[in-house]
Amino acid sequence: MTVDERSGYLKPHWPAIKAPRLAGTYQPQPALRIEIPQPHGRLRQRGLPPVTDRVIQPAIAQVLRWMWEPPFHPNRYGLRRMRSAQQALHRAQSEVIKGRKWVVALDFDSVFDRVKQDRLMPKLKAEIQDKARLGLLNGYLKSGVEINGRYEKTAEGVPQGSPRSPLLSNRVLNELDRERERRGHPFVRYGDDCPIYGRRPRAGERVKQSIPHFAEPTLGLKVHVAKSAGVRPCNRTVLGFTCSPRPGHTLKVSEKAVEKVNHPVRGLGRRTRGHCYLSAYR
């Protein structure tokens, strides 16, 4: 069944689709794994759920989002209602204005793919009382993936491509947010991008060395210490922007973001003389 055929199929078959899911007896089908090219030759894995599950999973995510919204740390801005990337940028800018002229960027290794399911499920059981809903979540986590027509189990990770994946990974990262708060680290988080701000390079170095000792054994998240670095805010890109070192600390679009836009634009027309710029867009 295709996405275009979904609406005509769901209406007459909805009672039969809904019943096993409410009873907790539904066995989710594996997601179709695809790979999307990323900059620097990397590949990002995505899991495309079956068409019927694309209706069910947003409903589950909506309930979990309502349940987990209050405990989420206030410095987390990604994938939350009434919060935006612009707010995250202004919060980062305010930390620099306060005199925190050093920022540590921790490089996590594929957060979505590293979530330990055996550590996540006990936490979900403590928070979700509905056994049918809990069983459905567990079934989705254990459903595995289909790669080139071949089934593979998934003992860890929450495949990207469904509405529940960022929510579950953020549930795990919220523990790291609370640990940063306990240590007094000023930070701003949007997804897995989480710059930590300090006043001196020495403080940044301590953060870079200490956070992995919590993230790896407690959450199962691997930090690339060699790739993590402490830099000036003017040299650290946050959501495509840097913070100027000049008075006022204005936000500036990063050179990489500008190049990302300019590169395809250059291919729209040849470099010739004597043409109106409007003709390049026709």
Model-found features: residue ranges?
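Charged boundary/loop elements
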Residues: 1, 62-78
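Short secondary-structure junction/hinge motifs that connect adjacent elements
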Residues: 1-9, 33-34
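Duplex nucleic acid-engaging cores and interfaces of nucleic-acid transaction enzymes
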Residues: 51-52, 56-59, 93
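A conserved non-catalytic segment of reverse transcriptases
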Residues: 142, 218-282
